[in-house]
Structure formats: structure tokens, C-alpha cells
Amino acid sequence: TTAKHVIDDLNGRIDMIIDDGSIEIGLESTIVDLTEDVPVILRPGYVTFEMLEETVGEVRLDKALMTGVKGNVKPKAPGMKYRHYAPKAELTIIEGSPEKTVARIEELVKEAERKGQKAGIMLSEENFDKICSDYKLCLGSSSDENEIACLRKFDDMDIDVIFSEGFSEEGIGQAIMNRLLKAAGHKIIEV
């Protein structure tokens, strides 16, 4: 998140924003609950499950990470319960083999265009050249962490719907998928 994104979201609702420029790591911090015998990751971030496990031993993931917090349950960490990091357009994540994912995204884009919608596509560097579109953005390598900036760019393009490939949930990919799932309201198509 950049200072501009914060201003866009919170202008008039907060008194001040301190902007120290861009950061190297495009993800928020990892939040860990240490109140139980085994540490529980409430929000994955740049410090990965694997890094924590190597340092402290056994670590668990909060069950709500992939399903979201439901009903009247109080979230244990910021950003757990509601659609978060969400673009204006509806976001759908497509998961499966790279070939099937690319083919399904192409079908979904054609469907959207037939309805007169402008469809944005988020792809990894590995799949970026496999689809032709004026409205596609590259997330970088499938282990990169600039998905929030991509979602914001789609807002600037007045995109109606966004289709993103899913990413491996190993290492930093876990945090990326966590943010994408929140932004998509957990809407996934398996292919």
C-alpha cells in the first residue's frame, strides 16, 4: 500500500498521513498469536510460515485464513473478517494447472466482453505472455508481492471485472493468496 492509496481510502477520515516513500516489501507484517502453546499465524506477511517454523519450531495457521471469519465471530487480527484490499471491480481467482487456468481466464474475459464489460487480468510473469489483452497486469514472479498495486491500477483503468490466476501458497505466496482471497471475497473457480 502506498501513501496515495491510503489518501484515496481514508482522505477526510484521518488527521495525518506520514509518507516515507516506497518500501522494499510490498506486504504488511505477519501477525502471530502467541497466547497458545503453539504460535498461530493470524495474518501471513513477509515473515513466512517456513521462516517462523525454522526459528520457533511448530507453528499453526489460523483456520480462518482461507475461509474468512464468519458470522458474529470477533476477528483476532486486523483485516480478517471483511472484504479487504478490494478493488472496485469484482475479482475472481482461477486456480488449477497453468494451461487450464490461462484457458479459463481467456473464456471468462470473452464472456465479460460480450456483456460489454472491461475485464482486467492479473497474471504471473510465467503466464503473462500467454494472453493478449489491453488490460492485463503482471504480478511479477509467482512469488512476488505487488498484487495490491495491481488491484489499484485496475481501479484507475475503470475495469468492471478482474480475473487473477491463483498462486502457490508456499513461502510468500501464502500472504499473496491471503490478500487476493480477501479482495475476491473468497470467490475462486477451480479448473
Features from the language model and the residues they span:
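Active-site-adjacent structural elements in enzyme catalytic cores
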Residues: 1-191
